[in-house]
């Protein structure tokens, strides 16, 4: 049983972000099932609402089934929002990433210094809108759990991607929209988080990968399958 957050989350346009998250979960389930010798398949239950889609999952024993190659990475893969090495992708790495989303999707790579700089500039500008938007403030306040490394249902502070000093300042400022607006207007409050969360990681990496559907996604199931493809690339 799924649900979406469009009623309170600015980023969940028409619930499609949540639908993609459902796809990521279903693909993780499918991969994990192979470790138990099971084939997992799913179908969107007809008539279930877009805001609360229901997925029927079927598990079938398959003796001799080989574990999915992505199985070991379910528990080890983590979000990394800090600067990384700029070592270019090898042909094998690029080929693996290109094949990961499966049929119906194309991977586009932005690898050169100029391309990464362009992406960084785009993220720098879009982050400004994100950080000054009053409608986004309640979302940011809700989803971060401060002073922790792990969280059951939110983004833990150590996964946000800022240094300790910036984290303490952000925690205090984000206690009220009035503080956020004052800092953004008069004290350059967007600069430090944009540098640390957007610009530097965008420049200091091997590549950016854009996953494009060969056919524009329409409806819940198409976005769920987009989440399946994205999860395979991420793992």
Whereabouts are the PLM-identified features?
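Acidic, surface-exposed loops and disordered segments
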Residues: 1-235
């Amino acid at each position: 049983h799924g649900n979406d957050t469009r009623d309170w989350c600015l980023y969940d346009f028409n619930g499609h972000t949540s639908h993609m998250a459902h796809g990521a979960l279903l693909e993780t389930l499918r991969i994990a099932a192979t470790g138990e010798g099971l084939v997992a398949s799913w179908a969107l239950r007809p008539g279930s609402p877009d805001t609360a889609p229901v997925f029927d999952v079927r598990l079938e024993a398959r003796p001799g089934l080989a574990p999915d190659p992505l199985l070991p990475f379910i528990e080890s893969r983590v979000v990394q929002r800090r600067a990384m090495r700029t070592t270019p992708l090898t042909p094998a790495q690029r080929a693996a990433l290109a094949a990961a989303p499966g049929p119906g999707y194309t991977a586009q790579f932005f690898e050169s210094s100029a391309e990464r700089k362009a992406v960084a500039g785009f993220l720098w500008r879009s982050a400004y809108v994100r950080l000054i938007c009053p409608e986004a403030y309640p979302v940011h306040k809700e989803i971060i759990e401060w002073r922790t490394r792990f969280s059951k249902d939110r983004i833990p502070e150590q996964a946000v991607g800022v240094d300790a000093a910036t984290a303490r300042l952000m925690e205090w400022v984000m206690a009220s929209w009035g503080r956020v607006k004052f800092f953004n207007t008069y004290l350059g409050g967007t600069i430090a988080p944009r540098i640390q969360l957007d610009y530097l990681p965008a420049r200091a990496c091997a590549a950016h990968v854009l996953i494009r559907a060969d056919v524009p996604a329409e409806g819940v199931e198409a976005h769920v399958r987009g989440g399946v493809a994205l999860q395979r690339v991420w793992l």
